[in-house]
Amino acid sequence: MTDNLRLHGFNNLTSSLSFNIYDICYAKTEEQRKAYIDYIDELYNAERLTQILKDVTNIIGAHVLNISRQDYEPHGASVTILIAEHELDEHDPEHIEPGPGPLPQTVLGHLDKSHVTVHTYPESHPDNGISTFRLDIDVSTCGMISPLKALNYLIHSFDSDIVTTDYRVRGFTRDVDGRKLFIDHDITSIQDYLAEDTKRAYQMVDVNVYQENMFHTKMLLKDFDLDNYLFGSTRRDLTFEEARDIEDRLRKEMLEIFYSRNLD
């Protein structure tokens, strides 16, 4: 496929990139578990998530049209940003003169195709001390904007122990001869768009369905330092047996999330 495709009219392809990012920790006591949830809830509140999504919008070359954000009680946050490929012209008479405005289906159609969303899900196990934080991000674009440009930035913006990534292209556009194009760029794997340092840091598994333009990559952090997973304590506070038991439990938790199955 050539680098510069000559298209007939607007590029109607929709590209969607979805992330599930997990941060895992061990908090021994109920007080430590509550403190972890409060800490992660404050660290990734709606205000900070909004800034991260604004950065994503800038990275992929889009423009912010509207922002909706919310912090939830007792914990959790969500942000949705409506984006456009081209910045709205504030001097365009359509935007400054009184009028009925766009039809609802126009606005909703745009929202369905070009938006960035994030939701957070803190969680803890009441008995074994394991706490997890899941963050879901969706970047969906139409036109010439590619959400793949945001891959590395998003992975490094969070404490990403496990990352599940899905990328798909839907719809079709046409070249100047009227021939349908169901994808407008070369891709064999999401890994094609990851930086080398990211590839070195993670164990990765692909499940791709090329004929359907669906690409799936799972990522598990290779480096394991127990101190990075202890909340409210350090390895020096533990006996050898305690440290080994906690490490085994953490590794099991991470593998179960990575493979999406219980390993009992």
Curated annotation (Swiss-Prot):
Record InterPro entries: AdoMetDC_fam_prok, S-AdoMet_deCO2ase_bac, S-AdoMet_deCO2ase_core
Organism ancestry: Bacteria, Pseudomonadati, Pseudomonadota, Gammaproteobacteria, Oceanospirillales
Protein's UniProt keywords contain Lipid biosynthesis: no
GO cellular component: cytosol
Binding note for cofactor: Binds 1 pyruvoyl group covalently per subunit.
Oligomeric form and interacting partners: Heterooctamer of four alpha and four beta chains arranged as a tetramer of alpha/beta heterodimers.
Protein name listed in UniProt: S-adenosylmethionine decarboxylase proenzyme
Pathway(s) the chain acts in: Amine and polyamine biosynthesis; S-adenosylmethioninamine biosynthesis; S-adenosylmethioninamine from S-adenosyl-L-methionine: step 1/1
UniProt-listed GO biological process terms: spermidine biosynthetic process
Requisite cofactors: pyruvate
Active-site residues, Swiss-Prot/TrEMBL: 114 (schiff-base intermediate with substrate), 119 (proton acceptor), 142 (proton donor)
Modified residues (Pyruvic acid (Ser)): 114
A Pfam family assignment: AdoMet_dc
One function term, GO molecular function aspect: adenosylmethionine decarboxylase activity
EC number: 4.1.1.50
Primary gene name: speD
Originating organism: Chromohalobacter salexigens (strain ATCC BAA-138 / DSM 3043 / CIP 106854 / NCIMB 13768 / 1H11)
